[in-house]
Amino acid sequence: ATKTVPKELLPVVDTPGIELIAEEAAACGAQRLAVVVAPNKEEIMRHFGEFSDLQELMVSRGKQAQADKVARANGLIEAVAVTQDEPLGLGHAVGCAEEALDDDEDAVAVMLPDDLVLPVGVMDKMVAVRNELGGSVLCAFNVSREEVFNYGVFDVEDAQAEIDGVEVLKVRGMVEKPAVE
């Protein structure tokens, strides 16, 4: 972790996590990205700003690839900030983002830049499942019994569906970070 750079801006190889999220959302057809930020972390939104002076300087020095990298985030998606005044958890953050939705928007994806799912393309598959079946779609993976205390654990039943190569299960219940028994 870091004390000076928000974790959302930490690079995964050479691209900040928040930019990877924006890229995947845009690739799935999203028009806007509501970024939930704490009052002291609004600088995260600067990443989606325009830096024409820096780009021009890089181009003048023959660094076109770097200039393109600087411009990339600004052209991916419209990013809007939503402030979460108190850190009251992920559910509260999602509720805060509701204010950014337009009346005709009925689908929301919760994407966390510090919890990347690889390979890229999982969101495309989730969109395909929602388009086919409707409702809420969650991405889950198996963990060893010894690791369950780190995760929310689902009780599932077979939905007898496979969409876009993905096994679809129906969630019956969930326990957040259970003790190993």
Question: Model regions: which residues?
Answer:
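Conserved beta-loop-beta/alpha segment of the NTase-like Rossmann-fold superfamily
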Residues: 44, 54-57, 64-160
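N-terminal glycine-rich phosphate-binding loop and ensuing alpha1 helix
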Residues: 1-60, 65, 84, 122-124, ...
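Catalytic-core segments of class I nucleotidyltransferases/pyrophosphorylases
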Residues: 109, 127-131, 159-181
